[in-house]
């Protein structure tokens, strides 16, 4: 595929016109022959195992199956690059063009696009201002729609007629004393009728009329008008025509995107799309032949309906009617199934690509970590930071080349861990938890090597990640360049993301175990009597006594304290004074739990 040099700002998805669909697949050969239309349902010849000409894998349309080799074998090797074989019409080029060259199927009768007919909302019924049920009846040949009422008094534009009503009006036209004048094709059924109705819409004038009606309407009618106007405005803005929602040609995607591969036993495995395309081509060819021999209307009509259903199944199998199934009664995967959903092309392959220097594991709580740290399993770290470790090993002279360094890592040599420790110091990693719904769903941390296979996460950042420890997994990414490392450290480090970008309020707040722990340390418990009333000269003495089991965590004790004390209860404070009234010592009533709580806060404030 030629490399695109020009830069672009965005990609726009819009409806393709029939001319554009054909232009995607059409090419003119040097001899003037135009190729691109797929006319045969065959895939490959069962004897030669070569693609059939004008079939779904045709080399003339899609390019050669082998690099630099035409179909008939007249031209081989790269020196014939760009030559089109006079005998078989295949261009001598790389086989990878079969990944992007398209074809098309010219339909013998128009068919509606099932997305625009059966989608929610149905754009075809919205634009035509007709109920979806009525539009479906016309499309699937259950009713006629009046396209030109002529001078008939009991007929009006877009009126639905049953078969009997249509025959009755036809009889009136050909009656001897009839004054009824109706043009040929005054009523039709099928996608052809919908195509004519959509083509008759003058978008600008219709939009103006709707805007005028909006001022006078209320309630449900107004809502309906707004919906129609919005669709019309979008068509006008994109330069699309409503009749393009009815297909007269359908694109055939490149053959390498719907491959056919030979299995060990000589059988073939093929993409479901090939079966769906084959159904469309078979029915299309049969319809063309029936029209050629002027078959009865009822037979042609039935074939048109079957063609409509085949195209529906190709675009979105199961959206309407019976689901087309293959072997083992398995529903065939249509184009929509390939695109949509979690396993679809966009979410699986385009938005969610696998990247190098990344890994994922289950998260567990790391209560001893600092806010900006995360525990990274050694097994994962050595794999993620392998290029840096190899570079450092060679730099230190421990090994001479990359191969030797890799062998050293595989042997789990004890020396690699000190090197790894040096490498990860100051090198932040990014942690991401899906779904990343806001920017705090991915944050930077300084890795700390831990044993085990789980990533350790600081409990305070759980709110930002919406994480809990019931089996959640997180992905680790290593920023490689110095710029990305600096950006991660300055902008994305967890300790720099204290406030929520949505509300501006703190998002790093104590929850669950932390709140319970703080409450338990500082709560009053009258039942805790062991060691109650004892005096201690320092907080360290009190904690030692608790550790030795001499006092309870919640027992009321007296602690010597030299600072200023504010209390609502004078009984919680005891001061010893000398004869002159000067304070000799001061004791406050507290608990060991409150002493521990106070110590932790004091240490944190001093450290910061």
Swiss-Prot record:
MF terms (GO), sorted A to Z: DNA binding; DNA-directed RNA polymerase activity; magnesium ion binding; zinc ion binding
EC number: 2.7.7.6
Pfam families associated with the record: RNA_pol_Rpb1_1 (PF04997), RNA_pol_Rpb1_2 (PF00623), RNA_pol_Rpb1_3 (PF04983)
Free-text cofactor note: Binds 1 Mg(2+) ion per subunit.
Protein name: DNA-directed RNA polymerase subunit gamma
Gene Ontology biological-process annotations: DNA-templated transcription
Sequence positions that bind Zn(2+): 70, 72, 85, 88
Reactions catalysed: RNA(n) + a ribonucleoside 5'-triphosphate = RNA(n+1) + diphosphate
Catalytic class of the enzyme: transferase
SMART domains listed in its UniProt record: RPOLA_N
Gene Ontology CC annotation, any one: DNA-directed RNA polymerase complex
Stated role: DNA-dependent RNA polymerase catalyzes the transcription of DNA into RNA using the four ribonucleoside triphosphates as substrates.
NCBIfam families: PRK02625.1, rpoC1_cyan
Record family assignment: Belongs to the RNA polymerase beta' chain family. RpoC1 subfamily.
Domain of life: Bacteria
Family matches, as InterPro entries: DNA-dir_RpoC1_gamma, DNA-dir_RpoC_beta_prime, RNA_pol_asu, RNA_pol_N, RNA_pol_Rpb1_1, RNA_pol_Rpb1_3, RNA_pol_Rpb1_3_sf, RNA_pol_Rpb1_clamp_domain
Subunit record text: In cyanobacteria the RNAP catalytic core is composed of 2 alpha, 1 beta, 1 beta', 1 gamma and 1 omega subunit. When a sigma factor is associated with the core the holoenzyme is formed, which can initiate transcription.
Keywords annotated in UniProt: DNA-directed RNA polymerase, Magnesium, Metal-binding, Nucleotidyltransferase, Transcription, Transferase, Zinc
Annotated binding of Mg(2+), by residue: 468, 470, 472
Gene this chain is encoded by: rpoC1
